[in-house]
Amino acid sequence: MTDTQAAAERIAQLRTELDTHNYRYYVLDEPSIPDAEYDRLFRELQALEAEYPQLLTPDSPTQRVSGTPASAFGEVRHEIPMLSLGNAFEEQDLLDFDRRVREGLADLLPGGDLLGGGAEVEYSCEPKLDGLAVSLLYERGQLVRGATRGDGSTGEDITSNVRTIRNVPLKLHGEGWPEILEVRGEVFMSKAGFEALNAKAVETGGKTFANPRNAAAGSLRQLDSKITASRPLEFCAYGFGQVSGTLPDTQVGILEAFRGWGIPISRELRLVKGAQACRDYYDDIGRRRDALAYEIDGVVFKVNRIAFQRELGFRAREPRWAIAHKFPAREELTELLGVEFQVGRTGAVTPVARLKPVQVAGVTVSNATLHNMDEVARLGLRIGDTVVIRRAGDVIPQVMQVVLERRPADAQAIEVPEHCPVCGSAVERTQLVKRSKGKESISEGAIYRCVGRLSCQAQLKQAIIHFVSRRAMDIDGLGDKIVEQLVDRGLVASPADLYTLTYEQVFELEGFAELSTNNLLTAIADSRKPSLARFIFALGIPDVGEETAKLLARSLGSLERIGKALPEVLTYLPDVGAEVAYEIHNFFADEHNRQVIAQLRDAEHGVQLQEEGEVAAEFAACASLAGFIDKLNIPFIAATGAEKLASRFGSLDGIIRADWLDLRQVERLPERAAKSLRDFFDEPANVQRALAIEAQLREFGMHWQSERKAVEGLPLAGQTWVLTGTLEAMSRDVAKDKLEGLGAKVAGSVSAKTHCVVAGPGAGSKLAKANELGVKVLDEDGLLKLFDEHGVAR
């Protein structure tokens, strides 16, 4: 076979593969490979066609914009084709683009020459949104048509759907717009909108989307515009098509005019001069990429002067005056070599993908999270599969999907080990149950756990690492490596063992000398008097983060109350749902955990908890009989029915004793609700449980109120404070804890709603902002005086 024949075969193969991917991407909205893989195939085809120009044909994917309109929508012919942009993947690609532009404008630039010398070119710069390109046609200021790009020449008529996008003006604002104006831009979905859409889909059992781009495309191409209207779509203009009238003579000027007419444009639009300034913009947007509210995959540079754009013109499928500088791919293809199982702090046995190493977003990736076995099942994953992996920012790489057409015949199923890979204990499957706000319990999949607890070194190490962390017991100098040594040498088998370590035991650890040994023992001793909130957080209760730990400590006041609180009682705490309440209750009900806590509180060697006291007034005053009845989750008894029952009978005992005739006298209480209530309390276990909950509420100081009361029991309740600069008497974390203990919310930024800013040495922009807004400012002495006034220990 000759080289030409081999090239012809490869070209035919590439064209078929690219056409297939184009169809899946543009028509079905179901991309089967990452953009980076498509770009590689496309560049390979371009290179072969350049080397063998006799094999170039008009129907090659390199000679047209991808996609064909779906038959379900009417067709729209674009008077001016909607072409795609050329791509730059390396800095040299950008420099080559700038050189070609300057060469093409040699006769128009001051001091220009045929080699691209002379003045620098002005470029407009904006992020490249990852959405769907559309055209909006305005006639006499009225929106008359919306269309997709389609194949660049013919798109789909999506007018009724475009009209539902809230930031698309149906009538242009102001004046001076052309009689006919075609606005081109991107329809996209913000990250927050995408997450909310998927969360809603999960709740209703609907289909979730893989990414915001797919969600935007799928939403925009709905035949029922009511569905589109329910989706959080947005539009951002980046250019224009046909125009009957006049527009400004620069790209930036046109976009600024759009903004004046009510058409949204990018807030990141900038005008720069020269290739280096373009590179600086690219770097700046790249650094801020993860903080942006929407997904982008690069930036777009366009020659700013429209006259220069016309002079440069077009080539086969793209303008010569614009280029998209792509970011390193966040999605790549690789092979799943195997799956290993790791054991976490709570004993959860989770699968981790071992991958054939691949570069993703500039980093070599060989491992990726699989979350849990439900995710493995959802993906339909097998060892040997070709998979799409994604890495964004600091997020752990994830397996996004399986490329089924590349699955090998010998692909192997993934099975959970029967025994813990670390300690050999049994692995048990636990069904997760979500207790919804309604009356039903909903299965949420399963989790696999090692039953070895602290006898499992993996669980023990992670438990100790969490226990000593800065926001928990804050034992300085006890890093991960030291914890591993302590566990591996058998010196620590429980968090309580930290407080019995001797000088000799620590001194013998690798890397320790006299000073470091004394420092560590001092740090351990200094942690013996933690606040109740820190101690609760340090215990590592599943689903209990730092804020929930503070809430528990502030509301219930003592470890004893928290430990014996029934889950139904815990749900009276704000932001504590049923799932978290059951996790807390089950943790303290577990005998093993109770033993560990008892060891930690040993009078001779353990910790002495601070800030233990009474139940908070806000918690004690928040209960109502109607709310209590509603929380019992009796079928057909909703909040309204519960209020009627509370009003009619006045006490739980009265409701329990009510017979059928009594219940029928409750105004507008449905018969099925009355029957359900009677059936519920005919079960002795339900009566016993309800009375136990009421008894504990009363023990904790609650009394039924006809309405919920908000008690302003803390001196700084409702106030927002900000800490900035360096504090000398205490760390900012300690100051934050003390302010929160007084009821304040401690924020990270200053606004007009900020009550006070505490500024230590080195305070910068936050102090300046406070002065600008007229916000009260305290120095450290003022803060300490405040603490003294309210009896807060320094």
Swiss-Prot record:
Entry's EC annotation: 6.5.1.2
Cofactor(s) for this UniProt protein: Mg(2+); Mn(2+)
Stored SUPFAM superfamilies: BRCT domain (SSF52113), DNA ligase/mRNA capping enzyme, catalytic domain (SSF56091), Nucleic acid-binding proteins (SSF50249), RuvA domain 2-like (SSF47781)
Catalytic activity: NAD(+) + (deoxyribonucleotide)n-3'-hydroxyl + 5'-phospho-(deoxyribonucleotide)m = (deoxyribonucleotide)n+m + AMP + beta-nicotinamide D-nucleotide
Top-level taxonomic group: Bacteria
UniProt lineage: Bacteria, Pseudomonadati, Pseudomonadota, Gammaproteobacteria, Pseudomonadales
Listed name of the protein: DNA ligase
Alphabetized SMART domains for the sequence: BRCT (SM00292), LIGANc (SM00532)
A Pfam family reported for this protein in Swiss-Prot or TrEMBL: BRCT
InterPro entries documented for this protein: BRCT_dom (IPR001357), BRCT_dom_sf (IPR036420), DisA/LigA_HHH (IPR041663), DNA_ligase (IPR001679), DNA_ligase_AS (IPR018239), DNA_ligase_CS (IPR033136), DNAligase_adenylation (IPR013839), DNAligase_N (IPR013840)
Record-level Gene Ontology MF annotations: DNA ligase (NAD+) activity; metal ion binding
Residues binding NAD(+), per UniProt: 35-39, 84-85, 126, 149, 186, 302, 326
Protein family membership: Belongs to the NAD-dependent DNA ligase family. LigA subfamily.
Binding site for Zn(2+): 420, 423, 450, 456
Domain BRCT: 711-794
Major enzyme class: ligase
